[in-house]
Amino acid sequence: MKKDLLFWGTIISLGFLILLGSGYCQHITDETCSVQILVPGLKGDAGEKGEKGAPGRPGRVGPPGEKGEIGDKGIKGSMGRHGKIGPIGSKGEKGDVGQIGPPGPNGEPGIPCECGQLRKAVGEMDIQVAQLATEVKFVKNVVAGVRETETKIYLLVKEEKKYIDAQDYCQGRGGTLSMPKDEATNSLIASYINHAGLSRVFIGINDLEREGHFVYSDRSPMQTFNKWRQAEPNNAYDEEDCAEMVSSGGWNDVSCLITMYFICEFDKENV
């Protein structure tokens, strides 16, 4: 671009000088007309480097460059501000039972009370509770239902006791050990034993007061009816003073100290 400007500048200057020379020679005809033609000289040596020019105007924004490679991971920044509190979490599972803590301090002395009436009431309550517990236990030990006649009720007690204890057990509830005084009653008790799946029970017959003289548990004497098995009573080892009934309905004399189930008998009028 600079070379073109220099060339055309030289041509224009040369033309201007030619015009001036031709006009000047027309007025001076008698004199010799000399024409000077300026011709560009040879290219000179390179000049010294000029001073740095002023900054040019900003150019247009170039197109976006290509995406560079991922840089190295930066240093961990400082902790940011706390965020909002999150929602309440679900209930966790129940933890293990903790260790037993140390005993606490002794409490202050209580206020003295007039406990005479209270002790009396508590004592009466204890008696009632004990009686109730005994009755409940009695009911639990009664098995195979109830057997009865027109005047009697029979209960089989599933609790092994000695003869005397069994008798006291029945008497404590208003009855006595069962007394089979006739064939019908004896058959009913035998059926009761079979139905319960037992082999024998105590019945209310003994000769505790007089050897060989058997009476019922109400101390009434035995009449003509009996169901002694063959060779019974035999008072084996000189210690068999009480009676049992086996599932067939027969009687044996046995020791009063062994334990077995028993049947209580109650009068319907007293129940």
Curated annotation (Swiss-Prot):
GO terms for biological process: antimicrobial humoral response; complement activation, lectin pathway. Ca(2+) 3 binds at residues 211, 238, 241. Residues 45-96 are annotated as: Disordered. The gene is colec11. This is Collectin-11. One of its GO terms (molecular function) is fucose binding. PANTHER family: COLLECTIN-11, PULMONARY SURFACTANT-ASSOCIATED PROTEIN A. Disulfide bonds join 170-264, 242-256. InterPro entries: C-type_lectin-like, C-type_lectin-like/link_sf, C-type_lectin_CS, Ca-dependent_lectin, Collagen, Collectin_CTLD, CTDL_fold. Residues 149-265 form the C-type lectin domain. A carbohydrate binds at residues 200, 240, 244, 252-254.
